[in-house]
Amino acid sequence: MKKAIRYSIIVCLFSWAMFAVVHWGFGIGADTPTGLMAFSTVYMFFPLITALVLQAIDKEKFNHTGLVNFKVRWSWVVAWLLPVVMVFLCILINGLMPGVSLEYNSEQLINQYHVPEDQQEMVREQMSSLPAWLMALSTIFSGLLAGITVNAIAAFGEEYGWRNYLVGAMREVKFWKAALFIGFVWGIWHFPLILMGHNYPNEPQWGVLLMVVFCVLAGVLELYFVLKSKSMIVAAIMHGTINAVSGMTIYFTLGGNDFLNGMTGLSGFIVMVVTIFCIWIYDKYISKDNILSMTLGDSLGRGIHDNVTMTTDHDHLCVELGGQGLRSGSGSPIDSLDPAYKKERD
């Protein structure tokens, strides 16, 4: 846990310091939306940079957790498509909120992104020329495509830290405690961007708190799929897809505010809580993994441990892995096992 705390402090201080340099040194902020958006993309890679530096200091391999794994499983597909389902549910729930109606319109887009007056009419004409169903389909298609390509690459910069390095540093911690810790760090890490109007342009101060709530809830989902798939790549895909499709909510709702609207508001929080509850039911009563009740290390090691038979023969330890016997001792193959795994077993 000390390693996780060390990383969390360093990544936040480093990221916030870089933001301070860009903000006060180059004037990047709420008044420069293009510059802020560009820096936000760069900002996403600071968790990766911090993790790599600490790994170099600690003499750890790049993929010491084994989670930079591109083996596709069914859970990848679920994590990729789930954001689309959640966004549609979010729109429906948003329509039940006070002062909000379900209506295909451009006004929410104009207000949310503070479109200049001389461009507002053009935005209205462009949206009115597209039927609602076509807008929805195009957003879904482009969002899913971006979610597994450019957005996933950008999200990898964050997820290598949150759902890879921190997971490796918290092997002994149980799922819920780890998810809460990682989500909280992920949320407060965003605070300079939030104060500049990112995600909550009309309520930046309250937005800092709302972002922490969002990150904790979204972090539970992402961590579950990482442990289920034994790969942090699935978190990058899910993160990238959420970023790509969540904007669809502003096309089909009218009214409301930053507290209520979208995946980062109350509507999205309700959807994610319901989704987490469904996963809890599945994990407890249907799945054989029971990830939510285990430590991160046990969840990650289950795929190995289930195939390992250990027997003792005097001073030797025999490990039968996949039908092949490995005998410990000087120069034996077992000595080449991942040191982190051997240490954990000891």
Model-based region annotation:
Residues 1-51, 78, 154, 158, ...:
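Transmembrane alpha-helical insertion/packing segments
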Residues 14-19, 46-50, 82, 86-90, ...:
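Alpha-helical transmembrane segments of multipass membrane proteins
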Residues 156-185, 227-231:
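Membrane-interface helix/loop boundary segments of multi-pass membrane proteins
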Residues 12, 45, 80, 144, ...:
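Residue-level signature of the transmembrane alpha-helical core
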Residues 204-206, 240-313, 318-322, 331, ...:
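C-terminal membrane module of polytopic membrane proteins
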Residues 78-101, 223-228, 232-235:
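Hydrophobic alpha-helical membrane-insertion segments
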Residues 54, 138-165, 230-233, 237-243:
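Transmembrane alpha-helical segments in integral membrane proteins
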Residues 18-57, 67, 73-91, 104-129, ...:
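Alpha-helical transmembrane segments in multi-pass membrane proteins
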